[in-house]
Amino acid sequence: MRTIRHKAYKSLGQNFILDPSMAEKIVSYAGSIEGYNIIEVGPGFGTMTEIILRSKVASLLAIEKDRRLSPMHKGLMQKYPNYRYIEHDVLEINLETMISAPSKMIANLPYNISVILLLRMLKYIHNFEKLTLMFQKEVAERLVAKPGTKSYSILSVLVQLLCDVEKVKDLQPGAFSPPPKVCSSVVNITPLGNLRFPVDYSYMLKMLKKAFGCKRKTVRNALGLPHQEFDALLAECRIPPSVRAENLSVEQLCAVSNFLQSRQYQFSTG
């Protein structure tokens, strides 16, 4: 196990994986990576990084904001010519341009940026064959949540519209250094290539923000639909009149979005 020489920064959402056997297990969830171009966000002390590099990958690009870790990774670059290390905030770079097929992402994501990074990547997530990512368990449960459950949210809908999602492993806080206050989960995200159901993604995103904006409101009240419009929606989409957005499946929400767009319904910004 590596020796910690630097204190983890809470502001960077750092919780390091230092046990090589644990890191190897996480990498294994990505399946075969030989010949792949891998992206790792938040490599930390490089425990998982070196395991990836020993797996005969075509290339590995690691992006790390903490400049204190650069010397360690520069040493790895000298050892592995197919390794590229960027010292930068991943939220401030154009990650899409750095993806080379065939590509997978394997990462113990900094918890403070995991959701916003994933939401941004949804625009080009089809460029990855697979993503094996570490999240806080609460976030992982949102990714795989079913309609009518407490964890079901906009994030659930968007990710499941674009990908197959599987929570493959829960990890206790003791697997990390320093131990986080919550449990963590490894999630496999496999992009579909196309939307699971036909829908205008940009329009649906606007609709979801309104529909999920007030969880206690029915779809009609959340969207501010006139009676006549709502009655037509009920007939077309076959949903109960008192239904809330969090009780509708991804397919049903797509149907609602398509119906409203066909009626050229515009959502108020208030």
From Swiss-Prot:
Enzyme Commission number: 2.1.1.182
PROSITE patterns cross-referenced by the UniProt entry: RRNA_A_DIMETH, SAM_RNA_A_N6_MT
Any one GO cellular component localisation term in the record: cytosol
First-listed, main subcellular location of the protein, grouped into a coarse class: cytoplasm
Top-rank taxon, per record: Bacteria
Gene3D superfamilies: Ribosomal RNA adenine dimethylase-like, domain 2, Vaccinia Virus protein VP39
Keyword RNA-binding: yes
Catalysis: reaction(s): adenosine(1518)/adenosine(1519) in 16S rRNA + 4 S-adenosyl-L-methionine = N(6)-dimethyladenosine(1518)/N(6)-dimethyladenosine(1519) in 16S rRNA + 4 S-adenosyl-L-homocysteine + 4 H(+)
Compartmental location: Cytoplasm
GO molecular function, one term: RNA binding
Cited InterPro entries: KsgA/Erm (IPR001737), rRNA_Ade_diMease-like_C (IPR023165), rRNA_Ade_Mease_Trfase_CS (IPR020596), rRNA_Ade_methylase_Trfase_N (IPR020598), rRNA_adenine_dimethylase (IPR011530), SAM-dependent_MTases_sf (IPR029063)
Keywords: Cytoplasm, Methyltransferase, RNA-binding, rRNA processing, S-adenosyl-L-methionine, Transferase
Spans through the membrane: none
Residues engaged in binding S-adenosyl-L-methionine: N15, I17, G42, E64, D89, N108
Top EC category: transferase
PANTHER family: DIMETHYLADENOSINE TRANSFERASE, DIMETHYLADENOSINE TRANSFERASE-RELATED
Function: Specifically dimethylates two adjacent adenosines (A1518 and A1519) in the loop of a conserved hairpin near the 3'-end of 16S rRNA in the 30S particle. May play a critical role in biogenesis of 30S subunits.
Sequence similarity: Belongs to the class I-like SAM-binding methyltransferase superfamily. rRNA adenine N(6)-methyltransferase family. RsmA subfamily.
Protein name in UniProt: Ribosomal RNA small subunit methyltransferase A
Source taxonomy: Bacteria, Pseudomonadati, Pseudomonadota, Alphaproteobacteria, Rickettsiales
Gene for this chain: rsmA
